[in-house]
Amino acid sequence: MQQIRIPLSKIVFVFLVVLGCQQEKKLPFLGPKEVGEQGDTLYHKIPDFKFLNQDSLWVSQKDMAGKIYVADFFFTTCPTICPKMKTQLLRIYDKFAEDDRVRILSHTIDPEYDGVRVLKDYAKKLNITSPRWNLVTGKKSDIYRLGKKSYMVTAQEDANEEGGFVHSGAFILVDQNRHVRGIYDGTKEEDVNHLIEDMTLLLKE
Amino acid sequence: MINKLAILGLMIIGISCESREEITRQQYVVEGMNLYQTNCANCHQVDGSGLKDLYPPLARTDLWQRVKMSELACIIKHGQKDSIQVNGKPYNAYMPANPKLQALDIAELMTYMREKWSPNKTIFSLDSARYALKNCP
C-alpha cells in the first residue's frame, strides 16, 4: 500500500488560508448601488441631514463622521414596540459605553409632540446623554423622507394604528462613511445580539 | 363506622373543592402569563423590572400592599393619565388603556402578577374583576 505524505508546510499553508478567509468576513453594503464614472461601484449613502437633539443642539452628518451609528425611528408616546426598542438600544448604549466611535441616533416620527423639551425629559428618564445617544426632532417631511429613502424603513402617520403612527422596529447600522451595513429587528433580543457582533466587526474596518 | 365514612367523605369533598380552586388559579396564572407578555411586558419588561425612570417596575414594589387590587384592575383596563408613585418615586409617562381586555383577562393577569410579585399569592377571581371594573372611577 502506498502511503500518501503531505508535507507539514502545505498543511500549515492551507490552515492559514482558511484562517485568513474567516478573518475577512465583511458586512455587506445595503441599498441601491450605482456605477460611477470610472466604472466603480457607488454604494448607497445617507445624505446630509440636520436635526435638533434633546439638548437643543444641531446634529448633522458631520457629527457622525468617522463614527459608526445605529439609527432608529420612534415616538415618546408609542404604546407598542418603542419601549422594546429602547430596552434593546440601552443594551447597545451600555455595551459601547467606553467607545467614542459609536453613536445612537433616534429620530422621532411625531415631531409635533416630541419637541426638544419632551425629548429631554425622555432622555433624562432613560438616563442617557448626547452626543453618544441623540434623540432628534425636525421637520416631519424631512424625517419621513430620510427614513424611507435613506434608511429604508417605513415611518408614516396612520390613524388606524395604535398610537397613530405606523413604523418598523428596525435598527439600521451605518458605517464610518455613511453606508448602510445592516438592518435588524430592534424588538428581538437575538437580532440585536447579532447587531452588536456586527458593530464590533465594523469597528475593525 | 358510618361516622368514619362520613368524615372521610367530607374530607374528600373538602380536598377536591380546594384543589378545584387551586386548579383554576393555576390556569389563570398560565393564561395570565401569556396576556402579560403580549400586553404589558413591552414597557414593564418580562421580569417586571420596568424601564429606568420611564416605566415603573412591578416586581419588588410596594404596589401590591399599598394600592387596592380593584384600583390596579381599573388602571390595566382604562390606563393611567396621572402620575403614580411606586417605591416612593413618581412616574408620569401615561399608560395606555387596554380596552380589548375583558374581565376574565384581567382576572388572569392579576392572578399571574400576584403569583409572581405579590406576597399574597391568591386568585383574583372573575367576580372580583367584574366587580372592580364595574366600579372604576
Which role does the model predict for each range below?
Chain B
Residues 72-81:
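Solvent-exposed helix-loop boundary motif
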Residues 53-59, 81-134:
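Axial heme c-ligation environment in periplasmic c-type cytochrome domains
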Residues 10-18:
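Hydrophobic h-region of N-terminal signal peptides that target proteins for export
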Residues 50-70:
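N-terminal, post-signal-peptide region of Sec/Tat-exported proteins
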Residues 2-8:
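Sec-dependent signal peptide recognition
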Residues 20, 46-49:
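Cys/His-rich metal-chelating microdomains
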Residues 17-35:
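Electrostatic cytochrome c docking/interface patches
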Residues 32-46, 95, 109-113:
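The canonical Cys-X-X-Cys-His
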